[in-house]
């Protein structure tokens, strides 16, 4: 592991433009079990009477808002992944000039909340909610505190979480920005995801840089195409690069 950490640090230190792609493994390291996982999906359907694909959809939000928000709050918000060391490690990398952009396929905004400034939340964020009619914005707390359906206090219609639900198109601006960032990257980090990812594979094909590094818990057949593979959770790897210690040392020196 020490040799790989040194090698990864060298790649990052010599990279002109580094982009990190954060996949579902980032949620798993925080204790979240994906709702599409077979056992989880079966459990949800047995408890709610509907499959995940039905409940986590715009059609369900529009036609059965009470059931949609019961599911959304219990399964997506109250079971949200815990913060891990990955968020602060990415922020330290960014501050050290070793990371130029984070592209997150998850909805929990962990990189941004960990301190990163340049983040593209490909599928939106649970922290962004608005009325579909008047566009008034509402906090996550407002959604959680609502007894049943969180309604706009101006229009009396259900507030819409600004996330991509199953079957919906990803925001076109996010898609364009993601493609542009990957195209100009010199180094691409795949964190908690693989080159065969349903979400990222359509973007990875635009990468023509020097180094593609995968940090993921489980091996995958597509790993052979990477420059380097580290089989572990990102939270166990990124802090070892030492950028957080460097950040702390610089902070102490300036105080």
What residue ranges belong to the model's regions?
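Conserved catalytic core of sirtuin-type NAD+-dependent deacylases
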Residues: 1-255
């Amino acid at each position: 592991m020490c040799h790989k950490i040194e090698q990864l640090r060298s790649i990052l230190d010599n990279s002109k433009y580094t982009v990190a792609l954060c996949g579902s493994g980032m949620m798993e390291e925080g204790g979240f079990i994906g709702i599409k996982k077979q056992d989880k999906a079966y459990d949800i359907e047995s408890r709610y009477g509907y499959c995940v694909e039905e409940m986590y959809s715009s059609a369900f939000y529009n036609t059965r808002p009470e059931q949609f928000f019961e599911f959304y709050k219990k399964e997506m918000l109250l079971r949200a992944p815990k913060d891990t060391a990955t968020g602060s490690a990415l922020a330290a990398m960014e501050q050290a000039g070793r990371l130029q952009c984070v592209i997150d396929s998850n909805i929990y905004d962990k990189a941004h909340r960990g301190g990163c400034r340049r983040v593209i939340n490909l599928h939106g964020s649970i922290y962004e909610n608005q009325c579909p009619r008047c566009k008034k914005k509402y906090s996550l707390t407002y959604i959680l505190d609502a007894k049943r359906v969180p309604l706009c206090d101006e229009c009396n219609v259900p507030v819409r979480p600004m996330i991509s639900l199953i079957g919906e198109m990803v925001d076109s601006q996010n898609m364009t920005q993601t493609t542009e960032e990957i195209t100009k990257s010199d180094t691409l980090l795949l964190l908690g995801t693989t080159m065969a990812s349903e979400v990222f594979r359509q973007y990875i094909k635009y990468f023509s840089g020097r180094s593609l590094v995968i940090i993921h818990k489980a091996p995958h057949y597509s790993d052979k195409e990477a420059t380097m593979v580290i089989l572990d959770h990102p939270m166990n790897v990124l802090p070892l690069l030492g950028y957080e210690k460097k950040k702390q040392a610089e902070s102490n020196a300036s105080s």
